[in-house]
Amino acid sequence: DILAAFRVTPQPGVPPEEAGAAVAAESSTGTWTTVWTDGLTSLDRYKGRCYHIDAVPGEEDQFIAYVAYPLDLFEEGSVTNMLTSIVGNVFGFKALRALRLEDLRIPPAYVKTFQGPPHGIQVERDKLNKYGRPLLGCTIKPKLGLSAKNYGRAVYECLRGGLDFTKDDENVNSQPFMRWRDRFLFCAEAIFKSQAETGEIKGHYLNATAGTCEEMYKRAIFARELGVPIVMHDYLTGGFTANTSLAHYCRDNGLLLHIHXAMHAVIDRQKNHGMHFRVLAKALRMSGGDHIHAGTVVGKLEGERDITLGFVDLLRDDFIEKDRSRGIYFTQDWVSLPGVLXVASGGIHVWHMPALTEIFGDDSVLQFGGGTLGHPWGNAPGAVANRVALEACVQARNEGRDLAVEGNEIIREASKWSPELAAACEVWKEIRFNFKAVDTL
């Protein structure tokens, strides 16, 4: 069975058992009345069952309802169908004040019907020939308004300075100021030029998201013909069907696939209603993507440390034990489905590097947009500062130093022999984003 954990807030006077049973019925075989065609099938075989209810500690009138769905209710290899069944209709139910899907357990038999990520972590490292450290990225800013030529120039400067990747912002598609084909050409030129200068393999996440699947394919095919290593997709606004199609294309044609989660906070930000990001992350691993944005813990965007690390492990690891302290409601066995690199992005800079290296470990992409392009000396020195800070943190960690305790000291030491890093340290020494996380257990 597929198991689901729902956070249920019933209307006043509705017992939790009734609310849990209503959720199970409405998201499987039930409807609002008895119908004569019920007799033509075996409802016992196909109906969802609410098998356990827990009160949520510290919350009045909130319960965790555990529901089991028989596998026969779902089309093989279709995230679209799985989510349509489980969360498609039930969230508008009048008997509920609010409803949130906290977690899913996907059984191995169903996992095996999915291709998953086009390549996965190990294959990506082999393609890039980069091992033993997190990868570095940068979102090109301003996100909108640059011409293709100036955009390509910014890409070149960042890659030349030492970054592994640069990135289209999620809303860069094909607007009047920069059509997609021009952007692809200038970015490809920047990639090959920086590769020739540095001797390292470089990439730029070319956003293939488009208004139709046919147009999306056209952009992905053009990227492959240019010989670039990676494309990008906005998987929630683009849709799971389009994403799975693109992931299959990427595996067949040797392209890596970077996933942006634009619109996720509309779905997952409210604590008592919607769907937790760990469900979106599991759905993405099944649908297919080699990178996905997963919060930073320390930057400008939402994310509590233990919860963030819980779903980061769900993205990367092969087997994850149930651990309610990290928000993991079920043990998940991915039966060798390739892993996804977590991308930390949003309001981070060189002073965050020790914390990011410690929190996310090697299998991650650390993306500094303003933290690269905001350097007072320009884009390339900004990239140099980030690369030096990262290499210093990785070396210190490998020598056995505690990044959580000695992080600032490690950055200060490195800045003595890197003027670019010293300048970056001076610019961002006072920047803080001290807000409490909304998403707590």
Swiss-Prot record:
Enzyme Commission number(s) from the entry: 4.1.1.39
Any GO CC annotation of this UniProt entry: chloroplast
Site-annotated residues for Transition state stabilizer: 300
Highest taxon above the source species: Eukaryota
Reactions that this protein is recorded to catalyse: 2 (2R)-3-phosphoglycerate + 2 H(+) = D-ribulose 1,5-bisphosphate + CO2 + H2O; D-ribulose 1,5-bisphosphate + O2 = 2-phosphoglycolate + (2R)-3-phosphoglycerate + 2 H(+)
Keyword Mitochondrion: no
Record's cofactor remark: Binds 1 Mg(2+) ion per subunit.
Keywords recorded for this protein, A-Z: Calvin cycle, Carbon dioxide fixation, Chloroplast, Disulfide bond, Lyase, Magnesium, Metal-binding, Monooxygenase, Oxidoreductase, Photorespiration, Photosynthesis, Plastid
Post-translational modification: The disulfide bond which can form in the large chain dimeric partners within the hexadecamer appears to be associated with oxidative stress and protein turnover.
Residue sites binding substrate per the record: 89, 139, 143, 261, 293, 345
Gene Ontology molecular functions: magnesium ion binding; monooxygenase activity; ribulose-bisphosphate carboxylase activity
Active-site residues annotated for this sequence: 141, 260
Gene Ontology biological process terms, A to Z: photorespiration; reductive pentose-phosphate cycle
Main location: plastid
Entry's localization field: Plastid, Chloroplast
Residue numbers carrying N6-carboxylysine: 167
Subunit structure, interactors included: Heterohexadecamer of 8 large chains and 8 small chains; disulfide-linked. The disulfide link is formed within the large subunit homodimers.
Family per similarity comment: Belongs to the RuBisCO large chain family. Type I subfamily.
Additional note from the record: The basic functional RuBisCO is composed of a large chain homodimer in a 'head-to-tail' conformation. In form I RuBisCO this homodimer is arranged in a barrel-like tetramer with the small subunits forming a tetrameric 'cap' on each end of the 'barrel'.
Summary of the function given for this chain in its UniProt record: RuBisCO catalyzes two reactions: the carboxylation of D-ribulose 1,5-bisphosphate, the primary event in carbon dioxide fixation, as well as the oxidative fragmentation of the pentose substrate in the photorespiration process. Both reactions occur simultaneously and in competition at the same active site.
Name of protein: Ribulose bisphosphate carboxylase large chain
Protein source organism: Apocynum cannabinum
